[in-house]
């Protein structure tokens, strides 16, 4: 059951006491609800629905004329027994900030060079395109790690959000930063002004990350079309992986799917953005 929770296959499990059907007539039947509480609002809603269904079903199972005490399920909360909302939004904030710093700031920084005319100076210099890209990306890479460390310290020491799992989430964060930097570079190749770069970054990255990545709304409750759109957002897989590693403390093997998707996105985006950027320089 723990493995199923870790893989995200289930959000709630029902555990029935031994000889449940026999004890139902004597009012001694017990049911335990085991719920994933990383999202407190969703866990509360699911527990309420399940308790009502169990109570109604228990009464319907009794023969006519037989009365027994209603079944009151015992609730067990996994990963977030205190039902703190910080457990849910901290991974989302991490994904949003990294996306904004890496993608938006990188694209604006490169487009600024075009507007001021300094890009032409770089074109006539013997500097290779790769070094131009690195010179623009490295500062935001370092800044992203500084912000990541700051968020982690605030989460642990101010919000009391523990880091339950291994530090492999740092590797996942590094991968996500590469993806975000590649997105910023790609945006810079299709925009000519800083305002355009900011609008494209905001509309294509910031708003979808906030609304469709699972940061605020559970992905399972979205319409099918929005779930399909969210599948192409890097932030969705990053937030999902960080929640599993930091909050649930699952084994690294249970986030291989998310890591594989992010790695594929990183390779594709870095390849495409570098080729387009090199073509624009030439």
Which residues fall in each region the model found?
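Membrane-interfacial helix-loop-helix junctions in multi-pass membrane proteins
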Residues: 79-83, 213-269, 281
């Amino acid at each position: 059951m723990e493995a199923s929770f870790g893989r995200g296959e289930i959000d709630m499990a029902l555990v029935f006491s031994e000889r449940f059907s026999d004890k139902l007539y004597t009012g001694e039947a017990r049911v335990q609800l085991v719920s994933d509480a990383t999202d407190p609002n969703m866990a509360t809603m699911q527990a309420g629905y399940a308790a009502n269904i169990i109570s109604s079903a228990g009464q319907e199972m009794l023969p006519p004329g037989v009365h027994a005490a209603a079944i009151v399920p015992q609730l067990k909360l996994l990963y977030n027994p205190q039902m703190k909302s910080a457990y849910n939004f901290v991974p989302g904030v991490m994904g949003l900030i990294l996306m904004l710093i890496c993608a938006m700031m990188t694209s604006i920084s490169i487009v600024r060079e075009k507007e001021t005319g300094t890009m032409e100076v770089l074109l006539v210099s013997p500097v290779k395109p790769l070094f131009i890209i690195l010179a623009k990306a490295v500062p935001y890479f370092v800044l992203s790690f500084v912000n990541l460390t700051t968020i982690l310290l605030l989460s642990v020491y101010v919000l009391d959000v523990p880091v339950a799992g291994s530090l492999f989430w740092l590797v996942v964060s590094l991968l996500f930063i590469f993806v975000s930097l590649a997105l910023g570079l790609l945006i810079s190749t299709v925009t000519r002004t800083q305002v355009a770069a900011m609008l494209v970054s905001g509309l294509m990255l910031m708003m979808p990350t906030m609304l469709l990545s699972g940061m605020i709304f559970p992905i399972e409750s979205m319409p099918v079309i929005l779930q399909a759109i969210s599948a192409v957002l890097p932030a969705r897989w990053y937030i999902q992986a960080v929640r599993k590693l930091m909050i649930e403390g699952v084994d690294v093997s249970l986030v291989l799917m998310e890591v594989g998707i992010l790695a594929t996105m990183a390779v594709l985006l870095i390849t495409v953005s570098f080729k387009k950027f090199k073509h624009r320089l030439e």
